[in-house]
Swiss-Prot record:
Topology in the lipid bilayer: Multi-pass membrane protein
Organism lineage: Archaea, Methanobacteriati, Methanobacteriota, Archaeoglobi, Archaeoglobales
A GO CC term assigned to this protein in UniProt: plasma membrane
Name of the featured protein: Uncharacterized protein AF_2102
Highest taxon above the source species: Archaea
Source organism (scientific name): Archaeoglobus fulgidus (strain ATCC 49558 / DSM 4304 / JCM 9628 / NBRC 100126 / VC-16)
SUPFAM superfamilies according to UniProt: MFS general substrate transporter (SSF103473)
Length: 217
């Protein structure tokens, strides 16, 4: 069903583009396209866009299917939703603390490495953890490191191209992240078991770590 919604939204977007263009706006659209293509020549932006595809895709897909995932780990429908809040709560703290530490150090890459590798390990631990207390503890720490990677990626993307193109660079990350969300939501649902989605997430975050090694700061 989500795939159908995604296709429908894409068709609507195409019709809007073809029929809803303002008069005299062709030169402006051409300029924006050239600007976007110019930004995509930046290696950091391309790598971070792929990382956003993976990271935000995992985040959205996990929260979409969190109840059946946690039910496989001994939680009821009622406790699954409550336990999942630990993931978001950890993310709130992480998104404040990790970027602040990064600012103090004047570095982004080491903290991205840390976030990705710890998140990959914690998704694996999540796959073998059972019981409300254990799962909640894992989710809190996972959210702390996993969610805090996004503000670091956005900042590194913006600084890689300069203030003039910062908005365009970050829009690329958001575009790829939305595509990743649709793709991974559908992929998670099609997998053999919900537990296998956690192992897939761990593997994809390991790939993100390897991609982050190619970033320049």
């Amino acid at each position: 069903m989500l795939l159908i919604y995604g296709i429908f939204a894409f068709v609507v977007l195409v019709f809007f583009y073809l029929l809803g263009k303002e008069t005299g706006g062709e030169m402006e659209e051409e300029y924006r396209l050239r600007e976007y293509l110019e930004v995509l020549k930046n290696r950091n932006v391309v790598i971070l866009s792929v990382i956003a595809f993976i990271g935000v895709g995992i985040f959205t897909a996990y929260l979409t299917w969190v109840e059946p995932v946690l039910e496989e780990h001994g939680l009821t429908v009622e406790t699954a939703g409550l336990t999942a809040t630990a993931f978001l709560l950890g993310g709130i703290f992480g998104s404040i603390i990790i970027p602040a530490l990064s600012d103090r150090a004047g570095k982004r890459k080491p903290f991205l490495y840390l976030c990705f590798i710890i998140s990959a390990v914690l998704f694996y631990i999540h796959a073998i953890a059972f019981g409300m207390a254990m799962v909640a503890a894992v989710l809190f720490v996972l959210g702390f490191f996993f969610i805090s990677a996004l503000p670091l990626a956005l900042d590194l993307s913006a600084t890689s191209v300069g203030e003039q193109f910062a908005g365009t660079a970050n829009s690329s990350l958001w575009l790829f992240s939305q595509v990743g969300s649709v793709v991974l939501i559908v992929l998670f649902e099609s997998m053999a078991s919900w537990n296998s989605t956690l192992l897939l997430s761990a593997g994809l975050l390991a790939v993100s770590f390897l991609l982050a090694l190619q970033l320049k700061e």
